[in-house]
Structure formats: structure tokens, C-alpha cells
UniProtKB/Swiss-Prot annotation:
The active site is at E115 (nucleophile), E206 (proton donor). GO terms for cellular component: extracellular region. Keywords: Carbohydrate metabolism, Glycosidase, Hydrolase, Polysaccharide degradation, Secreted, Signal, Xylan degradation. This is Endo-1,4-beta-xylanase I. It comes from Cochliobolus carbonum.
């Protein structure tokens, strides 16, 4: 999902400029939910779709959200925090997919500019398969593959930039559990994969020319 990642992150980054942030406003599910980000029930949320698929995103009570999509485009959305930290994140729910998709803790840092994923579940594409293998880390009942890649002149939260992409990809897939982000951050740092000042950090559902649906609850705020 190499091209998918860069396309999505650019669009998510752009939402702050393209759409006024919403505060404590529930999105109404429709054929294509408008792009946006903001806070809802104290949780940060972000949603973006390229409009190529029938896709809906709905903020629910507390840290819950739901998303459903049809084939034909790119989309990503979820709830969490802004800024991110080395917190332990607990999430639960259902995640159904047919094709290329992720369920992941997803975030960005600046100085250095880094896009990161802790992938908990994925569809037909393992994102670590086309990145530099950096070993493994065991956390929360599973081994995770660690990988790193360089995105050259790609869209980012700060416009078109060259930046690093960090991955931890869980081998025992799941759709509910706890993620100790400190374990992953420490493992990355031990391999020279350093982070900077945190921007947002969400439990995200992504789809790329696939179909699926998810109902996820995150332990935010």
C-alpha cells in the first residue's frame, strides 16, 4: 500500500486548510461523508476520502466510530488524540474487509518528519513487505515486524517533503486489544528510527480499492 499511504497522508494533512475543524459535531452518515477533522466527545478525529468509493464515516458516543466503504477509491478515518504520546491505547470492535485495508494506530511527528503505523490487522497487503526489514519486537501477545522506508518528494502534513515511514506490523492479527506505544517507540529508537514532536495519533481504518466496514471504540480522551 505504498502509493496509498502517501495519497492518504497528504489528504489528511490538507484537511486543516481545506475544511474548518469541527468541535463536538457528529458527522451524519451519507453516501460520501465530507472530509474533515476536529474533536468529538473529547477525542480527536480525522476522516478523508478521495470520493472514488461510496464511503461513510460516523462519530459515535465517546471514542467510538463506524466506517463503511465500497470499492473504487482511497479512504482513512478514526479517533484518538492530538498530540500523540507513548501511551497505551485500548481499542475494541469489529473490522471486516475484502481486499487491501489496514486497522492501525497511525500518526505523525515533526523534526524529524515521520509517518508511523502500528498495524494491528490488514487485508491482502502486508505493508512491511516492500520496506527495509529492521527486525521484530514482541509486544501485547504477538511479534511485530519492524520496517522502515523513505518517501521521497511525497505529500505530507507539511506539504511535499521527503520523510521516513516507520512500521510495526502485528503477525497475530486482531481487531481488539491494547497497544503499548512506548514499546514500539523504544524498539524503533533502538534501531535508529527516531521520532520528533508528535502531531495526531489515531486508531484508523483504511481502505484502498477494497470493500469493508468497521465499528471501533478507542479509549479516548
Amino acid at each position: 500500500m505504498v502509493s496509498f499511504t502517501s495519497i492518504i497522508t497528504a489528504a489528511v494533512a490538507a484537511t486543516g486548510a481545506l475544511a474548518a475543524p469541527a468541535t463536538d459535531v457528529s458527522l451524519v452518515a451519507r453516501q460520501n461523508t465530507p472530509n474533515g477533522e476536529g474533536t468529538h466527545n473529547g477525542c480527536f478525529w480525522s476522516w478523508w476520502s478521495d470520493g472514488g468509493a461510496r464511503a461513510t464515516y460516523t462519530n459515535g458516543a465517546g471514542g467510538s466510530y463506524s466506517v463503511s466503504w465500497g470499492s473504487g477509491g482511497n479512504l482513512v478515518g478514526g479517533k484518538g488524540w492530538n498530540p500523540g504520546t507513548a501511551r497505551t491505547i485500548t481499542y475494541s470492535g469489529t473490522y471486516n474487509y475484502n481486499g487491501n485495508s489496514y486497522l492501525a494506530v497511525y500518526g505523525w511527528t515533526r523534526n524529524p518528519l515521520v509517518e508511523y503505523y502500528v498495524v494491528e490487522n490488514f487485508g491482502t497487503y502486508d505493508p512491511s513487505s516492500q520496506s527495509q526489514n529492521k527486525g521484530t519486537v514482541t509486544s501485547d501477545g504477538s511479534s511485530y515486524k519492524i520496517a522502515q522506508s523513505t518517501r521521497t518528494n511525497q505529500p505530507s502534513i507539511d506539504g511535499t517533503r521527503t520523510f521516513q515511514q516507520y512500521w510495526s506490523v502485528r503477525q497475530n492479527k486482531r481487531s481488539s486489544g491494547s497497544v503499548n506505544m512506548k514499546t514500539h517507540f523504544d524498539a524503533w529508537a533502538s534501531k535508529g528510527m527516531n521520532l520528533g514532536q508528535h502531531y495526531y495519533q489515531i486508531v484508523a481504518t483504511e481502505g484502498y480499492f477494497s470493500t469493508g466496514n468497521a465499528q471501533i471504540t478507542v479509549n479516548c480522551p
